[in-house]
Design a protein with these regions (language model features):
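Conserved N-terminal structural module of periplasmic/extracytoplasmic solute-binding proteins
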Residues: 11, 28-146, 496-545, 551, ...
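Hinge/lid segment of periplasmic solute-binding proteins
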Residues: 135-219, 369-371
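Short, solvent-exposed loop/beta-turn-alpha elements that line the ligand-binding surface or hinge
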Residues: 151-189, 239, 284-307, 375-383
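C-terminal lobe and pocket-closing loops
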Residues: 357-365, 377-483
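C-terminal capping/gating helix-and-loop segments adjacent to ligand/active sites or protein-protein/ligand interfaces
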Residues: 449-527
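A structural signal for multi-pass alpha-helical bundles of membrane permease subunits
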Residues: 582-943
Length: 943
């Protein structure tokens, strides 16, 4: 009867599960066509739309432009498409083409820092019809097949450009070749310098146009706070300003005691955005294109680049002494989270910013001025030219939707739309900030006299001297590649390890650039010699074969470990389906869920490791090349080493302390509830708040909470804490040694030494100043033991402290909850054990070593496995929030994340993920073997 009921129940459960999947699935589409009773509605999905609820003038103008497009669309449709659609119903469908309207929808999706949102949408088949494109990611999007060419003659979008002539004056075509947009429209919208960015070879080797700018060109200028310049008696910058003038002004303004800094710079993987202006002004280039070979090459390793890096490093980290005798570093603020607020408060003297061609700026000209970027040492000015761009998604299936999407792109900056936006901005009080040429174009020439003096001229200089943001092969990675030498050079200067002479220092800078330029050419361009490629393939094949063999033995061992022993002297039982049928049936839903949502995706995704995987285009088989590249990739192995460091710190600081805390809370004679509440309180704070709070604690100036504390502790304090911990560890080691437990004794000695070195290292800046000979430092140690730290610590950017700084917030927030399970387990230890230990004369340490730890051994082991795996699993998110991988904290998981979702290298990222799994599987099997022998029993109830 039971079996019959079971046979009926299980199929019913699967049917309900299937129906639930059907009803909960909500397949989102991009654009589509709706047949209303008396009209046809074309729905268009756009990556973003202006918010109609935002009352600011600029947004109201943008909203008005969108509304005008929806109002005028029926006229455009009737003029350009209605008759064509009626004539070809097989291609365009049977719809009411006499009454058509359009509805726009803002694309939605998960927003993840560091990841292109539209990339996630494309991967999930939810891409908008109109994509946002910028210069640096344009090549990746073009070569990946994300963009639809806009100059197909049959479409009539841009028209036929095959015979077009493009020069410094713009584009020109013969009348017979026109079609689509006119030359006048194109020249009004597209700056001649932008044509190489949007018109180039695609994935099939054909030169086509892939995107169209909107909003006008963007030029980089130098903005400055007039109030700060006046406060420090500095003449305002001019068009003739040089690097020396910039440095002199930054030095005069910088006053960390008041929170004033000369120049705003930044950190993170794209810090080189700030440096690239100096690179171009010095005469250097990021990458160059050879039309004969149709190839790109990274070239930021020249002597000019070294000069730019040297100047930038001095701005960032040069050592100087303020009026109070305190050591300071650099003349810039690089705190990304606070820079915007500091600029608004008037605490930063200068910053680089973009100026829009149409709306020059909305800053207060009474407080903020702007000039072109300073001239370099050779008299060159290297501003940046950029532009926002729109492109059509290549997988728009319905040509009607694609035509409607193009009309949106075309109208966005059409003369009619720009005229309306200009009118609204003039009426809203922004007229004086509009480029005078548009004021004259639309009849507002009388407002031109109100425009801030020189702004239009400076914009023209920025465009004339500007170079397009890197747009070459895989240029989405360019900023990250150029940031590596910047970070290394800064750290060398912070550690006082750079030569004092200009020639020697430039040589060091040049060597850094050569090293990382070579890495950029390998990772971005793929420059690997045939001989090296052959070597990599051979090594990768050998390693993969070894892994397969190892996996075979590992899974065989797992099978043996978890096979139930036979009864008596019989053989081990295998599956025993008949005996355990009910148990197997109950496990089926859970097993199927794990199979469907874990193992099948893993197996399907694993094939990506052997391909140059493309989301839309056909992927190319590369064999073991991805594995060969990562085996010879220093950056990958550095990330693995960082992951090991992070895991060790997590185990040392978040696994063991809760055990110690639980013992103390158990033994404290009074106030147990109060202490437990105090230690548990941090757990009620959300993770994001914890991160933000600790990032404020880590502020690199003396105003940071942690620095304010550390600056008032003498060197002997750090050494004393380390020495105290060493003594405690040695006390434990001594008791273990007396009981002939030598392995444990050695472990405690090693832990004590590490704790001593770790805490004592905080005194290194006091005891061993940078640039001083070791002998001199040793002679001065007795006197320096009572000295204080000479300067604030840069906790999250200093490679020596960044990793542990990422772990400390976890310790603070996790110790309280982590000790609860041990407190519960300690309650299960019978009092008889402690009494027997007292009778035997056991000390407090003896009770911990020979009563507590043996009783908690199984629990500690289980938690250790979870803590170890969790340290690898959670490292990516924690590091991303705290440092973004800066300060030599990029762990393996974060490295894989950037490789896949920022650089679109899915094949190499998958190979890295598998390699990481291979490394961890041995540890996991070893722990499974131990856990298979653990016997669990309920704790005995105390009387």
């Amino acid at each position: 009867m039971k079996r019959k009921s079971l046979r009926r129940t299980i199929p019913l459960l699967f049917r309900l599960l299937f129906l639930a999947c059907l009803f909960t699935s909500d397949e989102a589409e991009a654009g589509w066509i709706e047949d209303a009773p008396d009209k046809t509605i074309i729905h268009l999905n756009v990556w973003t739309l202006p918010d109609p609820n935002n009352p600011d003038t600029f947004t109201r103008a943008e909203v008005a432009g969108v509304n005008l497009f929806k109002q005028r669309f029926p006229d455009f449709f009737a003029e350009r498409y209605s008759e064509k659609y009626k004539a070809l119903p097989g291609k365009y469908g049977q719809h009411n083409w006499d009454n058509v309207e359009i509805q726009l929808h803002k694309s939605t999706g998960i927003v993840v820092e560091g990841v292109e949102v539209d990339l996630l949408q494309i991967a999930g088949d939810l891409a908008p019809d109109i994509l946002y494109v910028n210069f640096r990611k344009s090549d990746n999007y073009i070569q990946a097949g994300f963009l639809y060419p806009l100059d197909k003659p049959e479409d009539g979008y841009l028209g036929d450009l095959r015979e077009a002539e493009i020069d410094g004056d713009g584009i020109s075509r013969s009348d017979s070749d026109l079609g689509g947009m006119t030359d006048e429209e194109l020249n009004c919208r597209i700056n001649p310098k932008i044509w190489p960015v949007i018109r180039r070879k695609g994935p099939h080797g054909k030169v086509q146009t892939w995107a169209v700018p909107y909003g006008g060109a963007l030029g980089k200028v130098l903005a400055y706070r007039k109030d700060l310049f006046d406060e420090y008696g500095i003449s305002h910058p001019t068009v003739d300003w040089t690097w020396d003038d910039l440095m002199a002004a930054a030095k005069k303004i910088t006053n960390p005691a008041k929170g004033h800094y000369g120049l705003q710079l930044g950190r993170g993987k794209h810090e080189s955005w700030y440096w690239i202006t100096f690179l171009w002004s010095a005469g250097g280039e990021v990458m160059v294109y050879d039309p004969e070979d149709d190839s790109w090459l990274c070239t930021f390793d020249t002597h000019e680049a070294a000069i730019a890096l040297d100047f930038y490093t001095h701005l960032s980290a040069e050592k100087w002494i303020d009026k109070q005798g305190k050591i300071r570093r650099g003349y810039s603020s690089k705190d990304a989270s606070e820079n915007s607020a500091k600029w608004e408060r008037g605490e930063i003297g200068m910053q680089f910013m973009y100026v829009d061609e149409k709306l020059l700026a909305t800053i207060n000209p009474e407080v903020v001025g702007m000039v072109p970027v300073p001239l370099g040492p050779t008299g060159k000015r290297g501003a940046e030219l950029n532009s926002r761009m729109m492109g059509l998604f290549s997988r728009i299936e319905d040509p009607v939707v694609r035509d409607a999407a193009w009309e949106y792109i075309r109208f966005y900056d059409a003369r009619e739309a720009v005229a309306l936006k200009t009118q609204i901005m003039v009426e809203g009080g922004l007229g004086r900030f509009i480029n005078p040429k548009y004021l004259r174009m639309f009849g507002y020439s009388e407002i031109e006299r109100l425009s801030p003096k020189g702004w239009a001229e400076y914009f023209d200089i920025a465009i004339a001297t500007g170079k397009p943001e890197p747009y070459g092969k895989n240029s989405n990675v360019a900023y990250a590649m150029m940031t590596f030498p910047i970070q290394e050079a800064e750290q060398l200067m912070l550690n006082d390890q750079l030569p004092q002479t200009d020639a020697a220092r430039l040589q060091v800078m040049h060597e850094l650039l050569i090293k990382h330029n070579h890495r950029a050419n390998v990772e971005m361009i793929g420059l690997v010699t045939p001989e090296e490629r052959s070597t990599r393939r051979t090594v990768a094949t050998i390693v993969l074969l070894a892994i397969v063999i190892a996996f075979t033995f590992v899974f065989r061992k797992i099978s043996r470990i978890f096979t139930a022993p036979g009864e008596g002297d019989g053989e081990q039982q295998t599956w025993a389906f008949r005996k355990y049928l009910p148990a197997y049936l109950m496990l089926i839903p859970a097993a199927l869920s794990i199979l469907v949502w874990s193992y099948i995706p893993v197996l399907r995704g694993s094939a990506m490791a052997f391909f140059d995987y493309q989301i839309l285009r056909e992927s190319t088989w590369v064999g073991v090349d991805n594995f060969g590249d990562l085996l010879f990739d220093d950056a990958w192995w550095l990330s693995v080493w960082n992951a090991l460091r992070y895991s060790f710190l997590v185990i040392a600081l978040t696994f063991m302390p809760p055990i110690v805390l639980a013992i103390f809370l158990q033994e404290v004679p009074r106030g147990k509830l109060v202490f437990r509440t105090i230690y548990y309180l941090p757990a009620v704070i959300t993770g994001l708040v914890t991160v933000l709070m600790w990032k404020q604690f880590y502020e690199p100036s003396e105003n940071g909470a942690l620095n304010a504390l550390m600056l008032h502790i003498p060197a002997i304090g750090f050494v004393g804490v380390g020495l105290a911990l060493l003594i405690v560890a040695l006390a434990f080691a001594r008791r273990l040694h007396l009981n002939e437990m030598y392995g444990g004794a050695i472990g405690f000695i090693g832990a004590g030494i590490l704790l001593f070195l770790g805490f004592s290292s905080l005194a290194n800046p006091i005891l061993f100043p940078g640039g001083e000979a070791m002998v001199d430092s040793l002679l001065h140690i007795p006197l320096r033991l009572f000295s204080f730290m000479p300067e604030p610590n840069k906790w999250l950017t200093n490679p020596e402290t960044a990793m542990i700084s990422c772990v400390i917030p976890m310790v603070w927030a996790g110790m309280g909850p982590g000790c609860l399970i041990y407190l519960a387990a300690l309650k299960g230890i019978p009092d008889d054990y402690y009494e027997a230990a007292d009778i035997d004369g056991a000390s407090f340490i003896d009770k911990i070593l020979f009563v507590v730890f043996p009783m908690l051994k199984a629990l500690i082991l289980i938690n250790f496995v979870g803590a170890f795996i969790g340290s690898w699993y959670a490292a990516t998110g924690n590091i991303l929030l705290m440092t973004g991988g800066g300060g030599n904290t990029e762990v393996a998981g974060l490295h894989i994340w950037y490789k896949a979702f920022t650089y679109l290298k899915f094949g190499p990222a998958t190979a890295m993920a598998w390699m990481l799994g291979f490394m961890l599987i041995g540890f996991t099997v070893h722990q499974l073997q131990i856990l298979s022998r653990v016997e669990f029993r309920a704790a005995t109830k105390k009387d």
